[in-house]
Amino acid sequence: MAETRIVVGHAPFSVGEEYPWLAERDEDGAVVTFTGKVRNHNLGDSVQALTLEHYPGMTEKALAEIVEEARGRWPLGRVTVIHRIGELWPGDEIVFVGVTSAHRSSAFDAGQFIMDYLKTRAPFWKREATPEGDRWVDARDSDKLAAKRW
């Protein structure tokens, strides 16, 4: 039976605490995880903080749809998607994607797919605090191109 966990919230997460749930199914031979962190720079400027906003309810629905689309493309076991919101600092963990499958190629591909679609389809808004002031972060062309490959 396939299982999915989706969490959007302010609380920090622990990669070490997420792994055991992903890894406990004996039918899954691959566990692939990705953890994204807040960088201390963007567009050539120093980033002092990052504030993430979302559309409650709609964001979780969009993430669930992304995971279901991944399940339609690859034979997946468990999937976890965690995305933090609120004010974050350089070095803070912001997103976690964990995917299990019988084989590594499906797990790797599905993990990349979920991240690529999360970056382009999930309703999150980012505001960076820089020494020059706050600014909203636009979607990157590279993220759009990455999503198009699927």
Predicted feature residues:
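N-terminal, polar/charged subdomain of small-to-medium soluble alpha/beta proteins
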Residues: 1-94, 102, 106-112, 116-150
